[in-house]
Amino acid sequence: MLFLRSAAFNLSFYAMSVVMVIGCSPLFLLPRSLTFKAMALWSHATLWLLRVIAGTNYEIRGALPHGPVLVASKHQSMWDTVVMTAILNRPAMVLKRELLWIPFYGWYAQKSRMIAIDRSAAASAVRRLIAQGKAAIAEGRPIVIFPEGTRSAPGTKLEYKPGIAALYRQLGVACVPAAVNSGLFWARRGFARKPGTIVLEFLEPIPPGLDRKSFMETLETRVETAAARLAGEAGGPSAIATRAVEKA
């Protein structure tokens, strides 16, 4: 049953995405605000399909970030970008430049002025990151960045990249850490979409003005501690797998 439900979701998700992405293409010629609405609609539709077909719900904890703020989140799944697009107002996502080359997806990212960085050019990438970050903050948008730079499996921690510290120092805004347990239900490069409740928790904001070392230590401690707690609440990978079999 898990296989069938996962297959049904994946087919529905890709079919819906193709229809919406192509159908909303004329928005490229219209004001950017309409592109944001289309992206939010796609995200809500994805979450709805996930709930109805796969039995995967979600819960948001903590205060929802508003306005010009830096959101630094644990990244375990594609779900993370989907939900951030659904619940935040005009988020500016930090993403790798290669994603801009994907037809339609890259066009939407450029139209909505997402922050694309070239990870092969360290110094210039940081300068570009800061310049685009300042532009997003000036527009009153929240910036969403995944400090590890890529998705990590539940229970693992990757090195936090220097870009987050540079943004925090240069932008002069609060940083809201965030933790998830999404990888237990929608794993990176995984086919299965497991039933249960994904939790995204926004943690206590870190005020501007800390030195680099204090900021990074505070950020990593809060995010990793919360991520471990959320994984424990869900029972970890073995418990998720057992519940999936029981519901089959």
Segments predicted by a language model, with ranges:
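N-terminal membrane-anchoring alpha-helices
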Residues: 1-57
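Catalytic core of membrane glycerolipid acyltransferases/transacylases, capturing the structured
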Residues: 21-39, 51-53, 69-122
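A generic structural signal for well-ordered alpha-helical segments
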Residues: 50-51, 109, 136, 168
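Generic preference for hydrophobic
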Residues: 60, 71, 93-94, 200-202
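Glycine-rich helix-loop-beta junction characteristic of Rossmann-like nucleotide cofactor-binding loops
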Residues: 61-65
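Generic beta-sheet signal
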Residues: 68-73, 141-145
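Non-catalytic C-terminal accessory region of glycerolipid acyltransferases
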Residues: 126-248
